[in-house]
């Protein structure tokens, strides 16, 4: 009896765990299936496939001209794919006109009507859709409160700040309650301090509204600070997608590694393997170790982020460390951190980034011979294949 009872309880527990895991999976909001696009004989997008879950803040990151804005315009309906399909909540919308797509869009210049008040700018969409005026007023009042624009409802665009204009554009884009909001570099025209503040505001508003955000930017810091998921584009193709931490810590190509922040690339030849520990000879610059299975005598590139490196001290370390020496050739102060450049014996440049509090502990100057340390576990390789 006890054995039967135990088995029954165990089965119930497994069913409960299974149900919970299923319910925690967010439903899919947007799916791009093998999207390709050319303008004349110039390919702009090449076989793009993306899946974005409901409530996600997804960022398309890439250099100017990589196709990210074209992809956004395609989802909105301003461009048509040459090949592939677009789905929202399981419904194909590839051939739907702009006005029938359940999306909102914020343009780079916000496109506010200068002759209309804040209230009337926000009301444009629902009035076009012939929504009753009391319902329009109710929705606008709710959005004015969320965006902290209550005192500006009767103001005109030329009389409000850039940050306030951005919030008006957001309210106008979401008043028709779209399934997904598309944002085409809406912060790029703002000064750096305001841009940082509005990034935080946008994230908070997205959490409040619960709308899926698809955000286009060429700014790495902006992408990583705002996104729950992101992808990096180059020349019309996706190089890698995942969480910001995944892409930063586990890049799958040298392009992604270099695109997301600074990085040191160490070129050498595999000298020895002991278990999963590999020794890489850097020629005149010395040797380092990293954890990977690589064939001996093979040419190999390894990478380490500047913030994972520090200057030698007598402090003991509880993990295997690498050590390199060189001449300090530059020191650049950036407020909260300091960047150093060290010339190694083979002439290559090695970058170090220290938080200000750590940097002031080192009394070093240009021209000094210095020694740097970094953990074996912080060195990674990239298999481009």
Give residue ranges: language-model regions.
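The feature captures the beta-strand-to-loop junction immediately N-terminal to the Walker
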Residues: 61-63
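ABC ATPase nucleotide-binding domain helices that frame the ATP-binding cleft
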Residues: 69-72, 168
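Helix-to-loop junction immediately C-terminal to a conserved catalytic motif
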Residues: 76
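Conserved coupling/switch loops of ABC nucleotide-binding domains, chiefly the family-specific signature
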Residues: 82-85, 135, 235, 267
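Conserved ABC transporter NBD signature motif
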Residues: 84-92
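ABC ATPase nucleotide-binding domains
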Residues: 98-104, 108, 112-258
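Glycine/charge-rich catalytic "coupling/switch" loops of P-loop NTPases
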Residues: 284-331, 357-385
């Amino acid at each position: 009896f006890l054995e039967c009872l135990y088995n029954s309880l165990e089965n119930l527990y497994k069913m409960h765990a299974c149900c919970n895991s299923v319910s925690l999976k967010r439903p899919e909001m947007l799916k791009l299936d093998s999207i390709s696009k050319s303008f004349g004989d110039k390919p702009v997008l090449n076989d793009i496939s993306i899946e974005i879950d409901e409530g996600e803040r997804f960022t398309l990151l890439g250099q100017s001209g990589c196709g990210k804005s074209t992809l956004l315009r395609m989802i909105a309906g301003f461009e048509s794919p040459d090949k592939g399909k677009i789905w929202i909540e399981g419904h194909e919308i590839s051939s739907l006109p702009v006005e029938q797509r359940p999306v909102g869009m914020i343009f780079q210049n916000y496109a506010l009507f200068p002759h209309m008040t804040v209230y009337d700018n926000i009301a444009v969409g629902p009035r076009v859709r012939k929504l009753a005026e009391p319902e329009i007023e109710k929705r606008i009042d709710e959005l004015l409160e969320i965006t902290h624009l209550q005192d500006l409802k009767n103001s005109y665009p030329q009389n409000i700040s850039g940050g306030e204009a951005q919030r008006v554009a957001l309210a106008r884009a979401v008043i028709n309650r779209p399934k997904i909001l598309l944002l085409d570099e809406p912060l790029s025209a703002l000064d750096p301090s305001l841009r940082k503040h509005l990034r935080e505001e946008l994230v908070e508003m997205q959490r409040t509204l619960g709308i899926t955000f698809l955000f286009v930017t060429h700014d790495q810091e902006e992408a990583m600070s705002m996104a729950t998921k992101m992808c990096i584009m180059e020349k019309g193709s996706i190089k890698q997608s995942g969480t910001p931490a995944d892409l930063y810590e586990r890049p799958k190509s040298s392009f992604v590694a270099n695109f997301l922040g600074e990085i040191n690339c160490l070129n050498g030849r595999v000298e020895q393997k002991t278990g999963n520990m590999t020794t890489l000879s850097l020629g005149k610059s010395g040797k380092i170790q990293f954890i990977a299975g690589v064939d001996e005598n093979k040419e190999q590139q390894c990478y380490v982020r500047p913030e994972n490196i520090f200057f030698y001290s007598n402090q003991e370390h509880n993990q295997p460390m690498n050590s390199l020496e060189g001449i300090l050739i530059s020191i650049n102060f950036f407020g909260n951190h300091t960047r150093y450049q060290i010339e190694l014996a083979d002439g290559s440049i090695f970058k170090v980034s220290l938080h200000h509090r750590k940097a002031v502990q080192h009394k070093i100057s240009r021209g000094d011979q210095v020694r740097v340390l970094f953990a074996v576990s912080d060195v990674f390789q990239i298999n481009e294949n």
